[in-house]
Amino acid sequence: SPCQCWGNRRQDHTLKFKNLKMEHKALPLHAHLASLPVYQPGRPLEEVARELGIPFDRVTKLASNENPLGPSPKAVMAMKKAAESAHLYPDGNGYYLKEKLAALHQLEPSQIILSNGSNELIEWIGHVLLDNRSNIVVSQYCFAIYPIVAAMFGAQSKIVPATDFGHDLEGMLQAVDASTKAVFVANPNNPTGTLVNAEALRTFVSQIPSHVLVVLDEAYVEYLEDAADFVEVVRSGAIPNLLLMRTFSKIYGLAGCRLGYGMASTSLVAAMEKVRQPF
């Protein structure tokens, strides 16, 4: 019968595979991955609530700095409207959003790049700058993703001891060497919440050698009443090795949308666009 024939053929194939004498070798993974730990995210809130036997709405996840107020009702309405087009691929270039952001910050659209949260921007920095002969400079209590991404590309992280849980800018400046490709400063800092004096930060940025990318992570800058205006520096082109990172995850309450953006020189944005996935 057809069933018996199929069964016989399947058995023949199984025997052939069993009789194959293959030398199994491990995949040639990048050696530096051996020392790179897998990132361990926090447990789902639903699981924590179930384990503790408490209502879901009584669980607050502090580690991710999520906005407890949630998104604007207008944003919710816009997302509901967008869901009607979920069968279509989105505009990967984010044409209209880039136009709006450019108008807001008085920049050219070519000076703005959209990303899957600011986390993806950090990875693009790795793609365009880092290798196993390079290093980055970070503060002791920095955002964990900076050194993780550096390790992904085989680069070293030069970690400068903190001063009162904040950035020792002079120490970070001294740590820069010929192999340094990027320096990261989050202001306000995540996770310690410290703030670098605006004038001190301006001086620091101006002193970094031109071969080193200065990354100012401004994920929380909208919470400041009187923030230093580094967008003006990007606008003027005075320091072409400057990248500002922003996100819609924090003050706008849109963490689930995974939307961030960078502001930089047109040449740096063009380089990152080359490694940005179109879909």
Where are these regions (language model features)?
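PLP-dependent aminotransferase-like
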Residues: 128-185
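Structural scaffold positions in well-ordered secondary structure
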Residues: 62, 183, 217-219, 245, ...
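Short acidic capping loops at alpha-helix termini that bridge into adjacent secondary structure
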Residues: 57-58, 108-112, 132-135, 179, ...
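N-terminal small-domain helix-loop-helix segment of the aminotransferase-like
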Residues: 23-119, 124
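Short, Lys/Arg-enriched N-terminal segments with co-localized hydrophobic residues
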Residues: 10-21
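Active-site pre-lysine segment of PLP-dependent enzymes
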Residues: 169-179, 191-214, 218-249
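Conserved core segment of the aminotransferase class I/II
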Residues: 238-279
